[in-house]
């Protein structure tokens, strides 16, 4: 059965935080959804942890990215995604419990091809989430040049429809990260 949700993550040297993030995502996935973990060869125990999760959860697929770098690693993850909705994830985040459900509702209500949501910043201390959002009060304004100069796109806060996938691939290697590329591409091709 084809997944409705694909969560994609680029992973490198992430053993310190990755378990907590994987658990926060897996708690929200159905049995038919998928979590794509694309990794570059790490110097720590990251690959071992990924393989452990792959054995324990049928939603998890681990794919190696032979090209080094975050852009190539995210591209590899997105290429392997099969879901109708693709969520980007960083390896050191923790997802709030209703993130996927709220984003799905937003897709259905708006018909948007790409959505962005708020985020909170936390430090290494347990329970250290600030009560003020990092993006609160920042309005995303129209205009490609403005987006290029001051990015309003943050991959950890981004989800998009499968229909955008063919437009964003391949992700160019260059001055912009994958999330800026995806956001600008969505803006160019918006309905």
Question: Where does each model-flagged region fall?
Answer:
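Short beta-strand/loop segment that forms part of the nucleotide-sugar
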Residues: 33-41, 63-65
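Short, well-formed alpha-helical segments that are part of the catalytic scaffolds
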Residues: 14-27
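A conserved acidic beta->alpha catalytic loop
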Residues: 24, 39-48
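Short aromatic/hydrophobic "clamp" motif used to bind/position activated sugar donors
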Residues: 86
